[in-house]
Amino acid sequence: LAGVGLFAIGALALAGCTSGGGNNGDGGDAGAANPDAIITTNGCEPENPLIPTNTNEVGGGKILDEIFAGLVYYDAKGAPQNDMAESITVDDAQNLTVKLKKGQKFTDGTEVQAHNFIEAWNYGAKLSNKQLNSYFFEDIEGFSYDADTELTGLKEVDDYTFTIALNKPASDFALRLGYSAFYPLPDAAFEDMDAFGQNPIGNGPYKIASDDAWQHNVQISL
């Protein structure tokens, strides 16, 4: 695969590189992060457009994990911690209730709501969409490898709450919800998914820098 450069611009890019104490030990200020700093890292050209349910390799995954956020993220010990989710209640090994934090936004300014997860997962699971990560949804009621179907196990309760019904007990299902296949998609994605994959709108700490930020086989700027 061709090598590409990944550029991240802004204070968040330095968050992992600066001291958490804010003091240099002699009473002076250690200095604030530079919001105009540019961090450059090596990567490889994504094999596919940047759609979470169709990305299963490192080149694209590395970028998706910066521009999207899921229901949970995994801490340094690999344990899930709530991100977009306010709470995930496992009613039993086959039924879950997800409540979202209010006020979370995509970079186009629209709010992240329950339907953004439901529609994204249905898109990923639909046979005719031929998504590489469709198997992530196989435990949800309504999933089929043989025909286009709706994930009937996903029900919107209100703008910030939805339920998940599984077709069989899966005690570890809640632990999987930080995987990129489970990221939400904004309404705009469904207007033109091909175009969206070239310039995705996410809900994570970074966004694609401009319409032409992805220079294929060269670099991508966030």
Where are these regions (language model features)?
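N-terminal export and membrane-targeting signals
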Residues: 1-8
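Bacterial lipoprotein signal-peptidase II cleavage site
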Residues: 17-29
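Short, well-ordered beta-strand elements
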Residues: 34-45, 95-98, 117-120, 162-164, ...
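N-terminal lobe/hinge region of extracytoplasmic solute-binding protein
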Residues: 42-92, 201
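Aromatic- and charge-enriched surface segment that lines or borders ligand/interaction sites
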Residues: 86-132, 163
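Surface-exposed binding/hinge segments that line
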Residues: 89, 134-187
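Gly/Pro-rich hinge or "lid" segments in bacterial periplasmic/extracellular proteins
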Residues: 170-222
